Amino acid sequence: MAQQAIVTMSALRRTMEVSDSGDVSIDISAEDSNDSFHLEESVDDCMDDCKPNNRPNPISMKPAKRRVFMVPKRERSKTPVQHTSPLNRLYPNVVLGKQHGYKQRPAPSARSRRPQPYSARKDSAAKPQSTPSNQNPLTELLKNVDPAIASRITEMRIPRSMLRTPSGQPFAHWLMPSAEDSSKFINVNPVNMEVEEHVNVVVRRCTEWALISSRLQDKSISTKYLAENFYDLRDFAQRSINKSAWINLRREAIANAGFVNLCAFADEMMMWLQLNLNNQGSWKACREDIILTGAPDMCFHALQKVRAFIKCFLRERHQRALVNALCHIICFEGGIKQAATLCQELFFDFKVGLMVLYFLTPYAFLYSHTIPQCNFGGYFSKCVAQYTPGAVTGLLNSAIEDHYKDCTSQDCTNLITAIVSPETSNKGLLFFPLPM
């Protein structure tokens, strides 16, 4: 036992010497490993003889031939780390480019974007042969058609099935209705209105006469009464329970009215605009009320009829050209902004021209006060402010009287009678303004 204790103490001393050494890399020799082997055998032999209280403490042994390295600690940089995406190098942002020193790539010139012109080889075999696949399918069918007409057909992208051959039929015969359908007549029911009681006497009188077609004298009201009852009339025009029915009734009457009744509708709208202008009404609400909703329809149908008699009524070339241009812009181009911009640059000095201006004014005035970026609102505000009751109808009467002083043509008389046609319906007309 004494000999085993001496061996254990000597092995322990050598182990402590190895652990206390300052060398970073420790290499355990074979001799030490043999001693440790004998030590382990001696410890195993005495485990049965020794009591648990007298057992030696286990000694932590490092495995043989293991190298231990100490990694030096890296010093951190005091400057902040900046991360730059490679996308910024290819497509640098203007702000980041100035901050990080990137140079912005110059934009390619227009010349560099253009593809290089195709230069065909002199060899005829190198030229692409025209095949039916790369040709326009309509080219062959339109080769004998007028180039202007062929260009319009191509722009409209009319399909090949709609192109007619020289000996073809003008339309598809299966579109023709049957004899039964041709003998039917559709019954158009009038607009149904709900019962609406009006306390104001003027409003009740206007609505009662507007439901029927009668003479303009029956619907005439003094401007004084209209001004005194303006707020009640405005409540009816904006908040009536039959608002949609009234609007449709007036549109139907305007579409089928003669020129005299169209002038009466224009006088009604001009007077209503002037009353709203004097009482600081809301133009957005006016644009959607019963009276002024039909301003575009009135302007369109009135100028359609003006175009029919300007050749005989207007002898001056510039007057005829101006009125014809305004009618064409409104009726065929739908450009109220272009027509209104043209009008504000002019001073009208002939009656038919002023009448056309009054047809345009309700439409252009509401357009300029509800659509931003319009610079002709002040011009048409002056037109509304300077309007006198019944001026549009008075201009028509004066123009016809002046014309018949010089014109004795029967054809002109028949044309004016057909256009004026005072016997047409004027349903929906609420009032005709009379001077005070």
UniProtKB/Swiss-Prot annotation:
GO terms for cellular component: host cell cytoplasm; host cell nucleus. One of its GO terms (biological process) is regulation of DNA-templated transcription. Residues 71-140 are annotated as: Disordered. Residues 127-138 have a biased composition (Polar residues). The keyword Transcription regulation applies. Keywords: Early protein, Host cytoplasm, Host nucleus, Phosphoprotein, Transcription, Transcription regulation. Residues 104-119 have a biased composition (Low complexity). It comes from the Viruses. Pfam families: Herpes_UL69. It is found in: Host nucleus; Host cytoplasm. InterPro entries: ICP27-like. Signal peptide: none annotated. Its main location: host cell. Belongs to the herpesviridae UL69 family. Acts at a post-transcriptional level to regulate viral gene expression. This is Immediate-early phosphoprotein 57. It comes from Alcelaphine herpesvirus 1 (strain C500).
